[in-house]
Amino acid sequence: MTKLENRSAHQKSHQNPHQWLLTGINWREVRLAYQVFLRNPGTGILHILRAQRQSIWQRWVSRRLAGQAADLMGRTIVIDLVELSKLPPDTLGGIYARHMVSLGLDPQAFATPEDNWIEQRTAVGHDIFHVIAGYDASPVGEFAVAAFTLAQYWDLLNVFVLSFVPLSLTNPLWTFPLLGAVVRGFRMGLTSAPVVAYAVEDNWEKPLHLVRQELGIGHYFRNAD
């Protein structure tokens, strides 16, 4: 081993674990994400996805999620909103399709050709999480879903989104609803079985309340259901 390699190994052995996770992050993309997120959240998210793609943190997340979803290895989620819209309005697929169509959303908006199977499942999972966790696409709902997802994934993207919570608390009308939604979303995410391991493509026709029960979060919706 050369002196340079020895020095690198020595530095890594003494590196803070949190610093090690940040290795490989594209900080230019992070800066761009912060510059545009409030004006254009979708563009900000795309910047963060690019920022984390080659990071050790994201590799750790992907390996852990792939392990949780090992029974689905190699499977991607194919979504046909036209067909799903024909399902009853109380089903997972029916509610998801109506959510997407009403907001004019593209299920593949955050997926890229470079994604492997687990990355594709997580890329299309955001709005599925909205439906399962019961949150709309309002700012409060988005923060709550980010908290739910962070508890499941422990990823950079949702850390980034939640970093805007303190700024949002400056709006007095949001303070208590926002804090309550974020805490509830995080607790629900910790309680839920891994949603990434749930074969949504096999359960579109299932009533949403049964999906929630199978994931272990049905009790959060007793009054709603």
Residues covered by each model-derived region:
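The feature captures two recurrent sequence modes
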Residues: 1-82
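Long, solvent-exposed, polar/charged low-complexity segments
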Residues: 2-8, 12, 16-23, 29, ...
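Core of folded catalytic or high-affinity ligand/protein-binding domains
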Residues: 63-213
